[in-house]
């Protein structure tokens, strides 16, 4: 007897939908890749992909765009996951940007993000000629992502046109692309932040320790707590790091990622926090505060 969709829990329905999308892409495209940002959404997406093809290995590689400014714990976690699961991991960095010394302090978050993230991603997609790329974005994160399709068409310059999106009826997706064009695929589109945390708890998925509360050195800038992760952190005159009990709801480059004061050091406690949260997790992403509509503008330029 087959289990109908109506008999599945909402998390199992989301899981089934995501696995269907991942398998569809693997079957439909010649050279797909999974973007691996090392965050909680990437952890769930990787877990779903491993489930989708178990006991076989993943039929596509993982790509991490390394800006050089990720948290140390993130890089250690990435390398450990690759070793544990044996997947093919591609690490790409914008060599020209690195040699030019592009950093979030001297060049600002907008220019830094464009060069070390957007341009680096486009370089990697062109270099390896990927025709589809999985990403862990969700529609509840931010308004420009809310209107993006599961299969997000990108032209030969990796640009997204929000006014020219393909219809998606039921679970049917149009993956037709010409040479040089590509599709960004978002299997977690219909998940919420709370869904992600509940699934991590139920499936016992490994995540970066930074998501759990611990006493860490931070400085407060414009109301945002920035963790001092290494000696490259530039302190302003008179600024002294304070030890506070904090955790992160979202992860990125450490000088541009805000922590939240919290005592939640277990998954049930994090889930309880999510039930009471009144702001988006991306409030902690300083790159989203550059200008009005900045995320949509970044996506039109090729950002994920």
UniProtKB/Swiss-Prot annotation:
Annotated catalysed reactions: sulfate + ATP + H(+) = adenosine 5'-phosphosulfate + diphosphate
Protein origin, superkingdom: Bacteria
Coiled-coil stretches: none
Any one biological process term the GO annotation gives: sulfate assimilation
Molecular-function GO terms, alphabetical: ATP binding; sulfate adenylyltransferase (ATP) activity
Pfam family, one: PAPS_reduct
Pathway note: Sulfur metabolism; hydrogen sulfide biosynthesis; sulfite from sulfate: step 1/3
Disulphide linkage map: none
Protein EC: 2.7.7.4
SUPFAM superfamilies, per the entry: Adenine nucleotide alpha hydrolases-like
ATP-binding found in the keyword field: yes
Record key words, sorted: ATP-binding, Nucleotide-binding, Nucleotidyltransferase, Transferase
Family that this chain belongs to: Belongs to the PAPS reductase family. CysD subfamily.
Subunit structure, interactors included: Heterodimer composed of CysD, the smaller subunit, and CysN.
NCBIfam families, A to Z: CysD, PRK05253.1, PRK12563.1
Function field: With CysN forms the ATP sulfurylase (ATPS) that catalyzes the adenylation of sulfate producing adenosine 5'-phosphosulfate (APS) and diphosphate, the first enzymatic step in sulfur assimilation pathway. APS synthesis involves the formation of a high-energy phosphoric-sulfuric acid anhydride bond driven by GTP hydrolysis by CysN coupled to ATP hydrolysis by CysD.
Name of the protein described by the UniProt record: Sulfate adenylyltransferase subunit 2
